[in-house]
C-alpha cells in the first residue's frame, strides 16, 4: 500500500508522517502546489494536509489552496484510482449557535470559512474529516499551543470564557487517518470527528499550560466581544466511534486526555 502526504512539513502533515512513517512526504509552501507536479499515479491513499489558515490568510492563496486545489486533487485522484483523506474545518460555521452537525448549512462570512467550504469535495473517493485541531508546530510558530508555550515566565494571558471548543490534537487526527488507511474503513464524504466533551478556550489554555509544565502562567478569565461556539456534533455517532476504535480507543477520548498524550 502506497500513501502520499501532501503538506508534510506543516503542523498537521508532520504529525501524520510521524504516525505513518512509510508514507511519501511532499513538503512545499502552501501556495506552491500544482496538481500536475505531484505525480499521484500509483498511490492508494492521498492525505491532503495542506491549507492556508487565518493567521496566514491572503485572499488569493485562500481560494487557490483551500478551494481550487482540493477540486483538482479530487479529479486527479479519481483518474488515478486513489482515495483522498482531507481535513475539513469547523470554520465553515459562523459560531453563532454551536452543536453543528454534518448537514447543517455553512454560514461562515469570512474568506477563510468560505474557501474551506468550497474545498469540501463530495465524491466517492474523497473523505472530509471535519474538526478543529491544535498541536505543536515544527517550524514557525503561529497557533495557540506554541503561542502559549513561548510566553515569558510568569506571564498573564487572557482566556475567553465565551469561546467553546471540542476539537482534537494533530496527533489524534493522525491516528484516525492511520486507522482509516490500515483498516480500509468506509467513511462518508463528510464526517465530524469529535472527542468526549467540550471546553472553553480559557480552560483549554489551562490544560495546555498544565500538560506542558507552564504552571507559572496566570490564565485570566475574559469575555471576548463576540461569543463563538463552533462545537460539533455528529449525525453518525456510530461512525465517529468506529473511527476512534480504529485509532485504538474504546471510546472517544476527552480533551485533557488528548493533551496529556500529546506531550
Residue map of PLM features:
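Conserved Rossmann-fold NAD(P)-dependent oxidoreductase catalytic core, especially the SDR/UDP-sugar
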Residues: 72-109
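NAD(P)H-binding glycine-rich loop region in Rossmannoid oxidoreductase-like domains
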Residues: 34-72, 76-78
